[in-house]
Amino acid sequence: MVPDLAELKDSQWSAEFETLMRNRLIMGAFRYGMIKVQKKRAKEGGKRYDVVRAVAEKVRLYEETGNTEHIVDAANYCLLVFELDPHPNKHFSAHDDAGGHCQIVK
């Protein structure tokens, strides 16, 4: 039986993870400015951060240490890539299940 939408919404997210993400994003606003200000600054040719590289580095650090702080940071950097990255071919194109997902390792 397929769960109803409310159950899926409740089970397919982590409130703790979201809280950790939001808390760190709020602290980041003090350090680096609010996301909408960073977006404006980037469009005007101002200072930008290499957030794509930061995602990979945070995942590497998590794999090395097991510290989930790095995964929270990687998730926030992914959000910043979505919002701020100036990739010239940036777009969203949904794909089906054909080969683009995690593989079973155990």
Regions found by a protein language model. Name each.
Residues 1-106:
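Flexible "arm" and connector segments at domain edges
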